[in-house]
Design a protein with these regions (language model features):
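Charge-rich, low-complexity segments
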Residues: 2-193, 308-367, 371-376
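Generic alpha-helix detector with strongest preference for long hydrophobic helices that associate
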Residues: 17, 52, 183, 187, ...
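A contiguous, surface-oriented mixed alpha/beta subdomain in the mid-to-C-terminal portion of proteins
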Residues: 190, 199-268
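Polybasic, proline/glycine-rich intrinsically disordered low-complexity segments
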Residues: 230, 239-359
Length: 376
């Protein structure tokens, strides 16, 4: 069963902004509205449907969590939950070994603070990201300065294994050879991964492209192929100093032949199989610490449960847009936060080959230049 959230907007034309109280009302992304056409909730709030997946719960709070999980799996990862056996383990050692072999760099550079203490094993204790690590005397520590205040403690750089398979459950994670992402707004690039055969080649190609440019980044890829295919099978994180590497990621990924499939509903299409999103910024209770896809799924789930409390099957487009705005989400482009800057490919010039015209900017807010140029 499919019912429209709002009247369909003709293809190629952005929805018009209604005026409310003298100010333009927030406009809900056309792509998100279409993705939510197959989502509804029973007026009693105990049953909801996301395409072919049915969700049941005994309370509004339980429905918010259950519906958010299904929205995440169906609309973000592209997998769905219907008739799917749960994954028994998040890790597959043989597959992780293939990913480790495909990783082009063995080490990363990490910054830490030398505490001046020794561990029980006699190792120097270095504090890295709030964790205390025992470092043998044979390891080289390069002092770069001292901490502020008091006597100050040495700030050091040290080489560590690039792979950190236990940091993000379900993913094999590495930091770049030149270091990982630092502070500032964090950009996520999602790459659709087809299967176990495609994953190592994609992983190697993208990371090699970044390493050849000495980009600081963090990347992760599904560590158990049973969870494939999925839209976010591989994720690359770029800080402000690395945003100009977006093209390198896209070109390397597309060269491997990414699989076709509907893009994640909440992310911004960059190219076929590649989408982007900013790290969520929502300090409300229950919304902090969520991944991008989880956060957007919870925003939508809350809006649908609120509609059921009014004995309706779905929220209006205006209510969904208001729910996005309350969560610091740009309703017109839900991959952005309301306080996000422009997409990097709008601010970092893309050099065109000599003699080739520079392509015009896209007409719609939902699609990046790369996506427009690659769409028939």
């Amino acid at each position: 069963m499919s019912t429209h959230v709002e009247e369909t907007v003709p293809r190629g034309r952005a929805p018009e902004r209604a005026v409310v109280g003298g100010a333009p009302a927030p406009v809900l992304s056309t792509g998100l509205r279409r993705a939510l056409e197959d989502v509804r909730i029973a007026p009693d709030g105990r049953t909801a449907w996301v395409r072919d997946d049915e969700v049941t719960a005994e309370s509004a709070s339980a429905m918010r969590f259950a519906l958010a999980r299904t929205l995440y799996e169906v609309l973000h990862t592209g997998r769905g939950v219907k008739d799917r056996a749960p994954v028994r383990t998040l890790r597959a050692p043989d597959f992780e070994a293939r990913l480790a072999k495909a990783t082009p760099h063995p080490e990363t550079v990490a910054e830490g603070v030398l505490t001046g203490r020794r561990s029980a094993a006699g190792r120097r204790v270095v504090e890295i990201d709030g964790l205390r690590v025992g470092v043998p005397d044979t390891a080289t520590l390069r002092e770069t300065g001292r901490t502020a205040g008091g006597p100050g403690r040495p700030v050091v750089l040290m080489n560590l294994p690039s792979a950190r398979p236990l940091v993000s459950p379900g993913f094999f994670l590495v930091d770049g050879g030149a270091g990982r992402t630092g502070g500032g707004d964090l950009l996520r690039l999602y790459l659709r991964v087809a299967d176990a055969d495609a994953a190592p080649g994609l992983w190697h190609a993208v990371l090699s492209g970044l390493e050849s440019r000495s980009v600081t980044y963090r990347a992760k890829i599904i560590s158990n192929p049973v969870s494939l295919p999925r839209n976010d099978g591989m994720v690359v994180y770029l800080g402000p100093g690395s945003w100009d590497a977006v093209d390198a990621v896209v070109e390397s990924a597309l060269a491997t032949g990414l699989p076709e499939g509907p893009p994640p509903a909440f992310a911004h299409v960059v190219a076929p199989g590649v989408t982007a999103a900013w790290e969520p910024k929502d300090g409300r209770t229950g919304m902090r610490g969520l991944s991008f896809g989880e956060h957007r799924a919870h925003v939508v789930a809350r809006a649908f449960v609120a509609a059921a409390e009014r004995h309706r099957e779905r929220p209006t487009a205006a209510e969904l847009a208001a729910a996005c705005a309350a969560a610091n989400v740009d309703p017109a482009d839900p991959a952005r936060n309301l306080d996000s800057g422009d997409w990097p490919w709008h601010t970092v010039p893309r050099p065109a080959p000599a003699g080739d015209p520079v392509p015009p900017a896209p007409a719609a807010a939902d699609v990046s230049p790369a996506a427009r140029d690659s769409t028939p």
